[in-house]
């Protein structure tokens, strides 16, 4: 360790720099000690130990912070990659199970379903029913008010897209509905939907079909009875 104003250092400094340096440190109350290191190339390295030690501490802290941050980012990326892989495998296992639909129909039907969705959006756009006077001018009709209502604007595009997928991708659509009922919707909601479907099917379709069948059967009986009576009357006349 040598003093900054040692002869070995002063000899290497030009006069102008020497005067400037001496003036700088003579104004300070404490003169720091400077460490001189000789390099094999002949250059000398001047450093203040206190400053070098402080910089080393900052460097070590920065390296530790960088390492911790790098490890956390790597763990986060690995965790997200595993989650994405799990979700892809879940979709393949539960929804996209039909190989033919996945390879041949999924891409074109997806575009067709997107087109059906935007068709529904166009059909329910208020500006197309007299509100903006683009296609149909004048006061909106009742049908136009119905088509441009908020429920229609929400339900019709989804219905058209869902119908398209259900028509051309029956296996994928049915698996999607089953997966949503099993893993997404609450149990009570799923039960209510199934009960409503069962009630609609039993009280609606089945009972209606039964009523129509009974009416047709009675009408057939009446028609046959009238035909028989007519034939009997004709025979009696002969």
From Swiss-Prot:
Compartments reported by the entry: Mitochondrion inner membrane
Name this polypeptide is given: MICOS complex subunit MIC27
Membrane topology value: Multi-pass membrane protein
Top-rank taxon: Eukaryota
Organism of this sequence: Candida glabrata (strain ATCC 2001 / BCRC 20586 / JCM 3761 / NBRC 0622 / NRRL Y-65 / CBS 138) (Yeast)
UniProt subunit comment: Component of the mitochondrial contact site and cristae organizing system (MICOS) complex.
GO cellular component: mitochondrial inner membrane
This protein's UniProt keywords: Membrane, Mitochondrion, Mitochondrion inner membrane, Transmembrane, Transmembrane helix
Coiled coil regions, renumbered to chain: none
Side of membrane Mitochondrial intermembrane, spans: 1-103, 163-238
TM spans (from-to): 104-124, 142-162
Residue ranges annotated as Mitochondrial matrix topological domain: 125-141
Main location: mitochondrion
């Amino acid at each position: 360790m040598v003093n900054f104003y040692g002869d070995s250092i002063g000899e290497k400094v030009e006069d102008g720099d020497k005067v400037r340096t001496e003036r700088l440190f003579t104004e300070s109350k404490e003169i720091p000690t400077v460490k001189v290191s000789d390099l094999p190339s002949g250059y000398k390295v001047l450093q203040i130990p206190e400053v070098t030690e402080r910089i080393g501490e900052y460097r070590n802290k920065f390296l530790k912070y960088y390492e911790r941050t790098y490890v956390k980012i790597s763990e986060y990326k690995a965790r997200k990659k595993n989650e994405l892989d799990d979700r892809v495998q879940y979709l393949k296992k539960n929804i996209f199970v039909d190989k033919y639909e996945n390879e041949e129909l999924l891409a074109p039907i997806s575009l067709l379903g997107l087109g059906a969705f935007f068709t529904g959006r166009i059909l329910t756009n208020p500006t197309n029913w007299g509100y903006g006077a683009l296609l149909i001018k004048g006061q909106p009709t009742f049908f136009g008010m119905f088509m441009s209502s908020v429920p229609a604007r929400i339900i019709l595009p989804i219905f058209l897209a869902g119908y398209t997928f259900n028509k051309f991708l029956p296996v994928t659509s049915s698996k999607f509905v089953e997966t949503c009922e099993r893993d997404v919707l609450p149990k009570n909601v799923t039960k209510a939907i199934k009960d409503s479907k069962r009630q609609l099917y039993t009280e609606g379709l089945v009972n209606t079909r039964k009523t129509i069948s009974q009416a047709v059967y009675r009408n057939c009986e009446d028609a046959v009875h009238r035909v028989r009576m007519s034939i009997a009357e004709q025979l009696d006349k002969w």
